[in-house]
Amino acid sequence: MSYVIDRRLNGKNKSTVNRQRFLRRYREHIKKAVEEAVSRRSITDMEHGEQISIPGRDIDEPVLHHGRGGRQTVVHPGNKEFTAGEHIARPSGGGGGRGGGKASNSGEGMDDFVFQITQEEFLDFMFEDLELPNLVKRHITGTDTFKTVRAGISNDGNPSRINIVRTLRSAHARRIALSGGSRAKLRAALKELERIKREEPDNLGDIQELELEIAKLRARIDRVPFLDTFDLKYNLLVKQPNPTSKAVMFCLMDVSGSMTQATKDIAKRFFILLYLFLKRNYEKIEVVFIRHHTSAREVDEEEFFYSRETGGTIVSSALKMMQEIMAERYPTHEWNIYAAQASDGDNWNDDSPVCRDILLKQIMPFVQYYTYVEITPREHQALWFEYERVREAFEDSFAQQQIVSASDIYPVFRELFQRRLVA
């Protein structure tokens, strides 16, 4: 009898390669479904998996076959309706196609193919080809920094890093391989001994011979050690270079009275999308949350998304606070500084020029990228036009977009953080 020991690392996911090939093949269908899911989901469901539906006609393999078109000369037997030399009209619907999956009194159809993508796959497609623009390495010191990461299993290592599960699995496989033949013979001998005792109880010679053989087989099996040095498996840890780039993202959200609940919800969904993108794509990045109405305040993540505080509108208060925090905690020669601002554009008229001056003189010269999102279905107001002057001065590091409804969130987000081709 042969024994096959499966030592593959991904034994529970034997179709991983096939699944990845399938996802690559139907990438466009999946990306479209992900975009639609992001637009319709609530804030709390933003990072879950998704069911993907692919039309049945799109999963058919190409097949070479005889076409139904062209002119053919065919001789049919005559009948009472047709006589020699008459031409028969071409049958309608001769394309050989299939139905679209709906009810019909003729033809055949195929249901859409539906499958589930995981949370990791959903986020991979959602943030594909996105990055923080102008990210550079700053504050390079003379010493390299490293981080320790898992790199599989090794046969040698420190006893403190022994992998008990893999060790016992290896020992069990070795015992099966070394004693499998003896165990099979032992089972056969025990079965034969039971038969002889039942059918030939007086055949003492054969009984003694079988008992002696059984004792030898058991002794041979017992000599196989439970654990051998060959079985020991250790977690392998290696050092990887740790990039020295440091980045911080400032999130500025308008919570003034002019922001309706629907507008605030759109702003929160935009910032949650941004927060997921940062935490997933960048291992070390700090996020500073600032809420503002007539005054600005730095808050934590919980208060930023769920506080109900409101008031008037002075946008410059948030910009001033951002500038103060930059000067106090984030030296520009060490940090890549980014900012994302969301507002409905409603601001005290005398304050909009102040916002422009703060951006032009105190913020934009020191940041890598600044994005402004205006959430309103109405015409733009003074703040938007002042920010246009900032964009003219900093074309590569300042961007502004308008969001009218929730369906615009994801397209605008991709437009703001689309990976740029470097010439």
From Swiss-Prot:
Record InterPro entries: UPF0229
Chain intervals for the UniProt region annotation (Disordered): 84-107
Domain of life: Bacteria
Disulfide bridge positions per record: none
Record field: transmembrane: none
Sequence ranges of Gly residues compositional bias: 92-102
Similarity comment: family membership: Belongs to the UPF0229 family.
NCBIfam families, per the entry: PRK05325.1-2, PRK05325.1-3
Name under which the protein is recorded: UPF0229 protein PA0587
Organism this protein belongs to: Pseudomonas aeruginosa (strain ATCC 15692 / DSM 22644 / CIP 104116 / JCM 14847 / LMG 12228 / 1C / PRS 101 / PAO1)
